[in-house]
């Protein structure tokens, strides 16, 4: 599989080939993904919750994102690597936003993703002008869950729906190459997808987007809580627990290590 580029990503919208994206946070996972046909890896700030054990993504730092982006990039996957910009790494001013986006690219990402709507237009323009591809993110934006009143579906009111449409158009105009739409009503995501010339990637927003993204821990059945919009394709949590328990039994009953697991001196 050859390296997926921004141009390939955008082309998939015109050819109506669905885009596939998953999160990854470490070298072993990225190495496994590199041997699949997945289109894109998101080094998501969701690592704060599924890797670092925080209650939300607000505690994730640039240092965290750089470290995990480097780990993923070391696997040299052909997939397009997109790295999340963490909370307060791009909101303060455009100068720091460009600097932090550049640090993620230097760490190995092919593009960055940031949350927010029309209020992020100038920031997006500045980062794109600096030569860094930007993916947008609207709908439920986890870094803004306090302002949104919690983790909820966005677009219930006419005002919210109109704002989502406006946000998507403003972000496209600002230069984003793709847009994540999270936890909105399916008809809204469909309208946005039809209006935009750039590909949309859904998570919890229905089947009419140009692609889908999931947190890999949800897909693998590793999460303590799986959102309603995620699907677990295997229960790795159970498989891992069973393996650990079998190891404990084998050690306690002197069934491990076996002869092939150690060396004896020759007599």
Curated annotation (Swiss-Prot):
Binds 1 Mg(2+) ion per subunit. 3-methyl-2-oxobutanoate binds at residues 45-46, 84, 113. Pfam families: Pantoate_transf (PF02548). It is an enzyme of class 2 (transferase). GO terms for molecular function: 3-methyl-2-oxobutanoate hydroxymethyltransferase activity; magnesium ion binding. Mg(2+) binds at residues 45, 84, 115. GO terms for biological process: coenzyme A biosynthetic process; pantothenate biosynthetic process. The keyword Cell membrane does not apply. Gene3D superfamilies: Phosphoenolpyruvate-binding domains. The active site is at residue 182. Its cofactor is Mg(2+). It is found in: Cytoplasm. Pathway: Cofactor biosynthesis; coenzyme A biosynthesis. InterPro entries: Pantoate_hydroxy_MeTrfase, Pyrv/PenolPyrv_kinase-like_dom, Pyrv_kinase-like_dom_sf. GO terms for cellular component: cytoplasm. It comes from the Archaea. Its EC number is 2.1.2.11. It catalyses: 3-methyl-2-oxobutanoate + (6R)-5,10-methylene-5,6,7,8-tetrahydrofolate + H2O = 2-dehydropantoate + (6S)-5,6,7,8-tetrahydrofolate. Catalyzes the reversible reaction in which hydroxymethyl group from 5,10-methylenetetrahydrofolate is transferred onto alpha-ketoisovalerate to form ketopantoate. Homodecamer; pentamer of dimers. Belongs to the PanB family. This is 3-methyl-2-oxobutanoate hydroxymethyltransferase. It comes from Saccharolobus islandicus (strain L.S.2.15 / Lassen #1) (Sulfolobus islandicus).
């Amino acid at each position: 599989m050859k390296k997926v580029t921004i141009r390939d990503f955008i082309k998939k919208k015109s050819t109506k080939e669905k885009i596939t994206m998953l999160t990854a946070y470490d070298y072993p996972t990225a190495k496994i993904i590199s041997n699949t046909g997945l289109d894109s890896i998101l080094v998501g700030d969701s690592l704060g919750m599924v890797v670092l054990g925080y209650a939300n993504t607000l505690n994730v730092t640039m240092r965290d994102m750089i470290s995990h982006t480097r780990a993923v990039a070391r696997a040299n996957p052909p997939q397009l690597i997109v790295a999340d910009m963490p909370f307060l790494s791009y909101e303060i001013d455009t100068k720091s936003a460009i600097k932090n986006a550049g640090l993620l690219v230097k760490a190995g990402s092919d593009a960055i993703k940031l949350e927010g709507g029309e209020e992020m237009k100038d920031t997006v323009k500045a980062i794109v002008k600096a030569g860094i591809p930007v993916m947008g993110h609207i709908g439920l934006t986890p870094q803004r869950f306090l302002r949104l009143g919690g983790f909820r579906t966005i677009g219930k009111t006419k005002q919210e729906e109109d704002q989502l449409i406006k946000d998507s158009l403003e972000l496209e105009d600002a230069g984003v190459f793709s847009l994540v739409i999270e936890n909105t009503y399916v008809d809204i995501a469909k309208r946005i997808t039809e209006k935009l010339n750039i590909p949309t990637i859904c998570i919890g927003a229905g089947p009419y987007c140009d692609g889908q993204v999931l947190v890999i821990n949800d897909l693998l059945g590793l999460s303590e809580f799986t959102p309603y919009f995620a699907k677990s394709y295997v229960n790795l949590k159970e498989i891992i627990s069973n393996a650990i328990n079998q190891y404990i039994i084998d050690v306690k009953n002197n069934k491990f290590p076996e002869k092939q697991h150690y060396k004896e001196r020759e007599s």
